[in-house]
Regions:
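S-adenosyl-L-methionine
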Residues: 1-122, 127-135, 139, 143, ...
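Residue-level signature of transmembrane alpha-helix interfaces in integral membrane proteins
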Residues: 139, 184-186, 209
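Active-site segment flanking the S-adenosylmethionine/decSAM binding pocket
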Residues: 95, 101-103, 129, 144-205
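Short, aromatic/basic amphipathic alpha-helical patches
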Residues: 134-135, 204-210
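Proline-centered flexible-loop/turn and helix-kink motifs
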Residues: 115, 186, 212-215
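Conserved Class I S-adenosyl-L-methionine
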Residues: 207-220
Length: 264
């Protein structure tokens, strides 16, 4: 109840505190569970370029390696969305907005795939903003700009028609996307990780806000398929552990606009 109140009435500090706490807890677990050492062995074998998935070739920098980097490196991260990304990456966009960018896997990965499109990466955690800048420099993506808190006022002032919006902001998604019905939303493609556990009712709120302008795909998380690598010094069990995400159940909405700017 307190967390829901904070996200509703104090979204800027609430999201910053939640993001920072979550990142510190995640980094601590990576070491406690032995995943940091497994990741280091995998990096020593395969290097620091992503070898699979929609963002193959992406360079993973030093700060990113504080995370459980195995799923990113192997291309198994959020593999439930791979088919979605295969379709999304075929479309033209005028702008890409990533809210809750973490270390920049999606923001910089998308910037490489759309080098002429401006990418704005938001994260309220100072560590994440630093990591995104490092990733953007290493991957030579000057089209990435990094910001802190994203709110409805920024969307109202800066969102362009035919944008791609990627949202993973720990319950802030309802306020960000539903508080102001913006014309630019009607032509945006959105990939939204839902956080019903933080803000009950946010799923229904987003559906109600966009059901007249978008088609919906609802994606549920599933177990990651372990990667098989040839000539690896890691055992099958180690490869399973290093390729799987440590997470609970997740759900995403993928919203596709029913019209394009040319049809308006």
């Amino acid at each position: 109840m307190i967390k829901q109140w904070a996200f509703t009435w104090l979204p800027r500090p609430a999201t910053a505190i939640s993001a920072s706490r979550g990142r510190r807890r995640s980094h601590r677990f990576v070491r406690q569970w032995g995943l940091h050492d497994l990741n280091k062995r995998l990096l020593a074998e395969r290097g620091n370029r992503v070898i699979g998935g929609p963002f193959a070739g992406l360079v993973l920098t030093d700060l990113s390696q504080c995370e459980h980097i195995g799923p990113y490196l192997l291309g198994t991260y959020e593999m439930e969305l791979h088919a979605i990304w295969a379709e999304v990456l075929k479309r033209p966009f005028k702008q890409i907005v990533d809210v809750g960018a973490s270390f920049g896997y999606y923001a910089v990965g998308l910037a490489r795939r759309f080098p002429a499109v401006p990418v704005i990466a938001f994260d309220t955690d100072w560590w994440a903003r630093r990591a995104v800048r490092q990733m953007a420099a290493a991957n030579r993506t000057p089209n990435v700009s990094v910001r802190g808190f994203c709110d409805p006022a920024w969307m109202a002032s800066h969102l362009k028609p035919n944008a791609l919006i990627v949202v993973d902001c720990e319950g802030h998604e309802g306020r960000l996307l539903c508080e102001r019905p913006l014309p630019a939303f009607s032509t945006a493609t959105l990939v939204i990780e839902l956080h019903e556990e933080f803000v009950p009712g946010v799923t229904a709120r987003i559906r109600a806000a966009f059901e007249r302008t978008h088609s919906f795909a609802e994606i549920n998380s599933r177990d990651t398929t372990a990667v098989k690598l040839q000539d690896s010094g890691l055992t099958f069990d180690e490869l399973r552990r290093v390729s799987q995400e440590v997470r609970g159940p997740q759900k995403w909405f993928v919203l596709t606009p029913m019209e394009t700017p040319a049809e308006r």
